[in-house]
Structures are given as C-alpha cells and as structure tokens.
C-alpha cells in the first residue's frame, strides 16, 4: 500500500509539472487587425501605418527599436558619434525631448544655438539613417526642473499650467510653433526623418486626460505636425483618446523613485509575464481567459502594445546609488517582448549632461550636471554594461521583427502564481517564439527541474526540448519555433536567435547557448538536401533533422544545403561571444563582427573604438570567422593632483595701524547664493563683519568657520575683519547656477583708513579641512586632450558622498558616489585644465548611517572622510577596418 501511495504521488507530481509547462492554443482566436487613422503615412512604398497590434513599414510588419537621446544634454560635436553608436547597436528611431526651459530660460528669449540646435540634430539623424520621434511637451519630466516647463510658466498665476486653460494653451501654441519652425519640411511625408510626435508626458489628471490631450493634438495638427504617429505616455490610468493618440507604456525595474533608504526596490508585476501594461490592477480590460490561457481581448484591444520608457539603465537619485548589472537589460527586454510589446522604446539610450542656465542648474532629483543614466551609451561616449544584452535583443527585433510583430502573446494562467516558472508564447497560430524568465532583480528564485514545454497549436503539438531540463535561478531566454530560415523550416531550437546575415545565395543565422541549457535544433526535412556540422551531432529522422551535442563557439556551424541550391548556416555562439556581436550594413552588404571594442559604421566604413592601443575583431564570411588585429601608437597621458588646504589661496594680512582690514567685493550674477562659507585663521578676539553684520563663527580646530549664506548678496559686498594680530581667510560661495566663487585675503585689502595691509604676519594655515566639515578639495592638472575624433577621458577614483568638478569656477561635472569610477571628458571642456587646474570638491557623508542605498561592497564608513585616490587618463583609439 505504501509503495502504491508513493507511486500515485509521483504520478500526480509529474502531471502537475506537465500541466504547468503546457499551453493549449488549438482553439484560440486571433484578434482582428484594424488600422488606426493617424497623420500622413509617408512616401509610397515606405508608408508607416499602425494597427491595433503592430506597425508596418512599406506593408511589412516591424518591431521598431527606439532609443532616447536628448540633444540639449550633449556637446553638439559629439551628436554624430552617439547617433552612430545607436544605429550600430540596432536602434532605428531616436526619441528626443524638446525641453522648453532650456530653450527659453527667460520669456521671449528663445535659443536654438549650439547644444539647442534642434534643426541640425534632426538633420544629423537623417544623415545617419535614423528616424526621429519628437517629444515636444510642454511638460516632459526628464528628471529636469519643473519637468521642462520654464520657471516663468510655472510661476505665472494667471493660468493653471498643464490644463485646458485658454491662456495656458496659447503659451503652449507659441512653444509648439517655435519647435515646428525648426523642423518644418522634415516630416516623414516630406522625405524627412520625423515619424512621430508625443504630446505632453505622464498626464494623469483624472477626467482631464482625453480633453487635454485631444486639445494638444488638435493644436499640433493645425500648426503642421503631420506625422504617421501621435503618441502619449499612458501611466496609471486606462483613459486616453482612443483612435486619436497611441498610448505608450514604460517599465523600470531599477526605479529609484519607488523606494527610499536602504531598502531594495519592491518587486513589481513588471518582473513577470503579465498583460497588465500599466500597474498591478489597471489595464485589465484588454485581457480574456480561455481555459488555462490568458490572451488579448480582440474586442477591447484598440491600440498596440508600444513602449517608450523601458529602463535598461537607471538614473541616480541622492538616496539611491544602485549600479545596474548587465542582466537588468536582458530581463526587462525579454519580459516586455514575451508580454507582446511591439515597439521597444528605451529610456535613456544615450546619457548626457545637464546644461547650466544663467540663473540655476536644472536638476530635479539627480545630480546637477550628470545625466549618465548608466545607459547603453554613457555620458561621455563609453559603452555601458547593459549595452551587451541590449544590442543582442535589438538585432533580434531588427531581423526577426516581421515574424515577431504579428505574433500575439499568450500567457499560461500558471504565471499568476508568482512562485511558478514564468513563461509565455507569442504566435500567429502557426509559428512563434517561446519566452521564459526565472529571474528577479536583486532577489533569488528557485531552480525549476524537469521542465519541458508543450505548445498545442491548431495543427500540431510541439514538445520543447526533447529531454527535460533545469531552468536555473537568473535564467531568461527566448526560443523560436516553426520559423522559416530561407527555404527551410526550423521546427524549434533551444538556443536564442540574435540576427541573420545574407551573402548572395547564402544566409547565416546566429544563435547563442545560454543559462546552462544544452542547445538543440530540430529542422523539417522538407527543402534540405544535406546537413553538415562542425562541433555538433546530426541525426536524420523520419520527419526531419535533429542536431544536438553542440559545442558553442565561433566554429560551431551547421550548414544546410537546400534543394533549391541555396545554403543556410546556423552558427551557435557562446554567451560571451554573443555579447561581442555587432551587426549592420556597410556599403550595401551585411556584416557580423565579434569584438570587445566599441564599433560604429556610417554605412561606408566600419571603425573600432577602444581605450587600449590595440584591438582585435573576428569578421564573419562564408561560414567562418577570420581574425584581424589592429595596433595604434601607445599614448601615455598623466594627470597630477594635490590636496588643497583650507584657505589655500589666501594670504595672512594685518592692518598697519592695528585696526580693521576690509575689502569690497562685487558678486556679478543673477543667480542666487545657494551656500556661502567663511573660513579664517585668527585669534579668539578677532571677528568678521560681512555687509555690516557681525559674523558668528564656530571654532573647527585650527580655524574658524561660519555659514554666511544669508549675508552674501548679488552685487556689492563689504567684508571686514577686526584682527590686530592678523588674519587669513577665504569666502567660498556656491551659486544656484553651479558657479563657485572664492574671495581671499591678500595684499589688495586695505586698512580702515585706506592704507595698504602688510603680509608679514605669521599664522598657521591648517593642512586639511576639519573633520566636522566632511570636506576635501583637490587641484587636478589634466593634460590637454588630443585633437580629432579620439576622445580623452579622465577616470577619477574617490570616496565620499557628492563630488563636484569646477573649471575656472564653472561647474562642469558632478557625481553621487556609488563605488564606480567617475568619468569626465577633457575633450569636451571649453578650457584647458593643464595650467589652470580642475578643482574637485568632495563632500563626505555626515555619518555612516545615512539612509542611502549603496551596493553591498561599499562601506559607508569609508565615505565619511572624503578623498580622491587616483586620476587615470585614458586615450581613445579608433581603428578603421
């Protein structure tokens, strides 16, 4: 009896497992496809049209790849390079915010020059071969002050901003007209690159969404924005102008705005396969359940699942300093595709630097300057960790988009139990892709053993793979089934597709084996004459060819000699090699190259980019990779730095007659005084006067310090000391526009009777800042950057809380400490730091218990007393191929 009970339990468990990994799509109805009326679709043969499921270009379904890049946050000399990096990594569309506050800091003073030259930016996009999605506001967010609304709009009490107040709409009309004047004649219908316009952003005023967005669209159309797509972000609410505007979704897994203190970001529904596009409980009206399958409700699905803010990197907020790992990108993209996303829009794809206004800096919750976002292309042109995973999926969407776009997502209802293995199927009823995710960001999942997926289609049942497998913690993947590869049919594969490459009558498909799951292919016998394998085993069976025992690598090649004379090759790479893959078109021909370097192609030449003086690339052609090496002339550039003492530039002075010493200073600025500190060395009886107010100073151990923020003013200032035995002092002023101003005691001071002061007094200058200040300053001499395209970068290693870099008093860079190197680019500085040093000001943590999230390898106690530990200069090398 006991044995019988055990056997029954085993059979029950096996049955439960089988049910969990089974999806029955035999009787599922495919949603009706209906096109949405937008603006002019563009030139004949290239029309961009959108239906309730996907986008077509020239009648061909596509899964476009869109990346966010803010032209106003980058030196325009580097726009082209960043755009080429986007295109070379598989991006098709550039999304960009037009940030009103940067263009019109003061009412009536619009600027379109330099980094604000929108017209030139859009021209460059066209030259490079990228389409443009304008996000014209008026409100944008973008982690910028007021979300991009100018202060003079926010402060205008004659209307309510972000409403249908007629006066506000007139201001918006004026802004829309100003933007349009820069892109007139550049719409897609004109042969230009502008294919879409986003109206407003994150507008969630209940009851006002439809009327306000409709009013903005009507205005934009009247002005001349005639484009294939009008869009909006669709956050937190299910109402939107259906049939008028396409809603876009956003998905951030690392989201610093969702948590505080040292807590991890909470797990959200975004980390599971789900149809809920907006939040945990909204957006369910488009879902229907048939049997054990969750799918789209064709009757209620009126818009495609498009995204504009899929976070593969993350911004940094002061309380949260997370460093995103490579797998963050792969996890998020894989989940979005498995849930049915048909436009992949990344935010951000290219990092940048906030410009500085005349009155203030423009940050919202992050650093004042840095908007690096840990993006695939980072603030100063280096590639982010997440680029490796991101570009693999980009190439997949580029090359397999025509078969992926019409494939509807079907989710087993077992996914609703979050502890179960998460998986999904996208299919048009015959072919498709199987997606699986067993990863949670910064958390562990169990390993799932004895997994084999069963997909029941109308005409057949697929069981993938042949032998049960273990899906380990952190695994995520997508597998194809019933996909046409040239004239052959791939019944299924347990390796992930990346891209394809055509060479005459030969086509190569590139896959990679990942996550400890053995790769296998099963191909229909039809259309194949002979199969040849290298580093794989092949068995001819009744219904096809079974290929397994793969040894992934550059030489793992399966060659299919087809009955029509064509050749199809399947190359199975390792995961590491797939990270190195670059795919593109050069001089009209496809290329696939493996390299650890960065790579760009302008369509005529391919260039490798590296911070080492040598590089190598493996170039694919005719079934094999061939290695090429490149060698540049090594260049050794060195930086020097020294720690600055308090009052580093001050001289000790005293009055000839023993009375007051004084000096007038003029603070020539329209910015506000954000912080001002007085530091001085003198005896206890001495005191300071600032603008006729006696300063209350605190002894810091070696010097006196006072917070004089409320005493310093724009314009004329009078500063005096009563110090018969002499004084040495500095006044450090930090302005709201990022400027740092220092006034020192020196020989230009006078006594109260206008006699010159003497500088022969002996005072002990402190060598370091007092412990209570948690402050360290350094003068960094950086060699002049080399001229040309090859960028020179400085990598600063430091410990502390917040670091700021000043060049001749102007703030040029900043960093919230997160344990990684702080990168700056001397190539982008408008002045040299070889003679006039860069001043690096590092503020330490007030205590080791500050409620700030750091990575586990950071010890906050080490950040209380700040320090700069190294400055490394790295020179970029470019190798034409």
Residue ranges: model-predicted function:
Residues 20-93, 863, 875:
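N-terminal carbohydrate-binding accessory modules
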Residues 21-24, 39, 387-688, 693-698, ...:
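Non-catalytic C-terminal accessory domains or segments of carbohydrate-active enzymes
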Residues 79-145, 217, 221:
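Aromatic-lined substrate-binding rim segments of carbohydrate-active enzymes
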Residues 108-116, 138-163, 170, 177, ...:
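Aromatic- and acidic-residue-enriched segments that line the glycan-binding/catalytic groove
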Residues 117-128, 132-134, 157-194:
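An active-site-proximal structural segment forming one wall of the substrate-binding cleft
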Residues 171-236:
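Active-site neighborhood of glycoside hydrolase catalytic domains
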Residues 204-225, 233-274, 353-356, 416-422, ...:
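Substrate-binding cleft/loops of secretory-pathway carbohydrate-active enzymes
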Residues 214-231, 274-363, 428-429, 440:
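Catalytic-core region of carbohydrate-active enzymes that cleave or remodel glycosidic bonds
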């Amino acid at each position: 009896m006991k044995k019988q009970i055990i056997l029954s339990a085993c059979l029950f468990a096996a049955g439960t497992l089988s049910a969990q990994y089974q999806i029955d799509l035999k009787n599922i109805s495919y949603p009706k496809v209906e096109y949405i009326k937008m603006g002019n679709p563009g030139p004949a043969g290239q029309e961009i049209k959108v239906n309730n499921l996907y986008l077509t270009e020239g009648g061909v379904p596509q899964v476009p790849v869109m990346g966010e890049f803010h032209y106003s946050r980058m030196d325009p000399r580097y726009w082209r390079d960043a755009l080429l990096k986007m295109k070379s990594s598989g991006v098709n569309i550039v999304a960009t915010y037009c940030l009103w506050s940067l263009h019109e800091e003061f009412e009536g003073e619009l600027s379109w020059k330099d980094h604000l030259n929108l017209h030139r930016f859009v021209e460059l996009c066209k030259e490079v071969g990228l389409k443009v999605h304008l996000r014209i506001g008026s409100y944008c967010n973008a982690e910028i002050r007021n979300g991009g609304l100018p202060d003079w709009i926010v402060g205008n009490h004659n209307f309510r901003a972000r409403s249908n107040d007629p006066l506000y709409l007139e201001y918006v009309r004026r802004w829309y007209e100003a933007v349009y004047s820069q892109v007139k004649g550049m719409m897609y219908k004109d042969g230009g690159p502008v294919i879409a316009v986003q109206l407003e952003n994150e507008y969630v005023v209940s009851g006002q969404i439809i009327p306000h967005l409709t009013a903005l669209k009507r205005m934009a159309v009247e002005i001349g924005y005639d484009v294939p797509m009008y869009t909006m972000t669709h956050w937190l609410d299910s109402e939107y102008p259906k049939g008028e505007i396409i809603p876009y979704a956003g998905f951030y897994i690392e989201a610093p705005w969702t948590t505080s203190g040292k807590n991890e970001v909470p797990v959200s529904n975004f980390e599971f396969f789900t149809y809920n596009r907006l939040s945990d409980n909204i957006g369910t009206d488009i879902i229907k359940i048939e049997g054990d399958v969750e799918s789209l409700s064709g009757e209620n699905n009126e818009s495609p699942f498009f995204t504009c803010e899929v976070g593969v990197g993350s911004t940094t907020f002061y309380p949260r300093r997370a460093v995103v790992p490579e797998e963050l990108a792969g996890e998020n993209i894989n989940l979005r595709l498995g849930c049915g996303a048909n436009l992949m829009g990344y935010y951000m794809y290219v990092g940048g630097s906030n410009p500085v206004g005349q009155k203030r800096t423009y940050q919202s919750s992050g650093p004042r300057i840095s908007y690096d976002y840990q993006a695939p292309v980072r603030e100063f042109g280096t590639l982010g960790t997440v680029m490796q995973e991101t570009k693999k999926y980009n190439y997949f969407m580029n090359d397999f988009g025509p078969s992926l776009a019409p494939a509807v997502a079907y989710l087993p209802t077992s996914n609703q139990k979050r502890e179960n293995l998460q998986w999904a199927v996208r299919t048009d009823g015959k072919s498709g892709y199987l997606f699986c995710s067993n990863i949670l960001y910064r958390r562990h999942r169990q390993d799932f053993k004895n997994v084999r997926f069963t997909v029941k289609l109308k005409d057949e049942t697929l069981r993938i793979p042949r032998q049960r497998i273990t899906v380990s913690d952190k695994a995520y993947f997508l597998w194809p089934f019933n996909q046409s590869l040239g004239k052959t049919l791939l019944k299924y594969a347990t390796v992930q597709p990346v891209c394809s490459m055509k060479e005459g009558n030969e086509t190569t498909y590139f896959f990679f084996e990942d996550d400890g799951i053995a790769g296998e292919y099963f191909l229909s016998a039809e259309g194949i004459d002979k199969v040849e394998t290298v580093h794989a085993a092949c068995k001819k069976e009744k219904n096809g060819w079974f290929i397994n025992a793969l040894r992934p690598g550059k030489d793992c090649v399966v060659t299919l000699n087809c009955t029509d004379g064509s050749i199809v090759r399947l190359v199975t790479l390792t995961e590491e090699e797939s990270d190195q893959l670059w795919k593109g078109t050069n001089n009209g021909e496809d290329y696939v190259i493996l390299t650890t370097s960065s790579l760009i192609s302008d369509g005529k030449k391919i260039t490798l980019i590296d911070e080492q003086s040598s590089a190598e690339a493996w170039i694919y052609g005719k079934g094999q990779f061939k290695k090429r090496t490149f060698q540049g002339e090594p260049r050794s550039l060195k930086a020097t730095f020294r720690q600055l003492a308090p009052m580093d530039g001050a001289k000790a002075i005293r009055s000839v007659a023993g009375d007051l010493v004084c000096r007038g200073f003029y603070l020539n600025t329209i910015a506000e005084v954000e912080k001002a500190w007085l530091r001085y060395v003198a005896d206890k009886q001495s005191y300071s006067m600032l603008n006729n107010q006696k300063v209350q100073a605190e002894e810091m151990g070696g010097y006196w310090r006072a917070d004089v923020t409320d005493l310093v003013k724009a314009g004329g200032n009078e500063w005096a000391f009563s110090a018969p035995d002499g004084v040495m002092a500095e006044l450090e002023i930090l302005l709201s526009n990022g400027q740092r101003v220092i006034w020192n005691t020196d020989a230009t001071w006078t006594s109260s009777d206008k006699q010159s002061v003497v500088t022969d007094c002996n005072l002990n200058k402190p060598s370091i800042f007092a412990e209570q200040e948690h402050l360290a300053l350094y003068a960094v001499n950086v060699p002049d950057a080399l001229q040309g395209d090859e960028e020179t970068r400085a990598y600063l290693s430091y410990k502390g809380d917040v670091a700021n870099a000043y060049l001749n008093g102007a703030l040029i860079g900043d960093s919230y400490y997160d344990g990684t190197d702080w990168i700056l680019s001397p190539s982008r500085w408008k002045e040299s730091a070889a003679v006039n040093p860069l001043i690096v000001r590092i503020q330490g943590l007030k205590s080791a218990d500050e409620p700030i999230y750091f990575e586990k390898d950071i010890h906050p106690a080490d950040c209380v007393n700040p320090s700069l530990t190294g400055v490394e200069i790295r020179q970029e090398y470019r190798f034409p191929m």
